[in-house]
């Protein structure tokens, strides 16, 4: 279903002080328990000038399905090397050309 699609997977927060984390990339494997993604991690951080920290190099991530809060399907043309983030009021959003912008977290989090 999601295999070979570009997605943004936002993880659940286990406790209030936890930083919001999302993974952006191509799904390489998908089953009832795991999602395997080849992409980059995006984390909301107060100490960063842009408000978010993006991995410099792509990597493979194995994410448990019950740890995922939401999955947004991105256009196949989305380039993970050109991730742009904007602020919309109190929210950090990832800019998606030819698609809907994705929520990453809020200003006070992280």
What is each of the regions a protein language model found here?
Residues 1-110:
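Conserved RNA-binding domains used in RNP assembly and mRNA/RNA metabolism
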């Amino acid at each position: 279903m999601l295999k070979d699609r570009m997605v943004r997977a936002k993880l659940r927060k286990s406790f209030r002080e936890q930083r919001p984390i999302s993974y952006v990339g191509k799904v390489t494997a998908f089953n009832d328990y795991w999602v395997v993604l080849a992409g980059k991690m995006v984390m909301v951080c107060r100490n960063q000038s842009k408000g978010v920290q993006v991995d410099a190099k792509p990597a493979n991530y194995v994410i448990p399905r019950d740890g995922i809060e939401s999955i947004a399907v991105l256009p196949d043309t989305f380039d993970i090397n050109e991730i742009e983030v904007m602020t919309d009021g109190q929210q950090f959003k990832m800019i998606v050309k030819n698609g809907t912008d994705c929520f990453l977290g809020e200003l006070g989090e992280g």
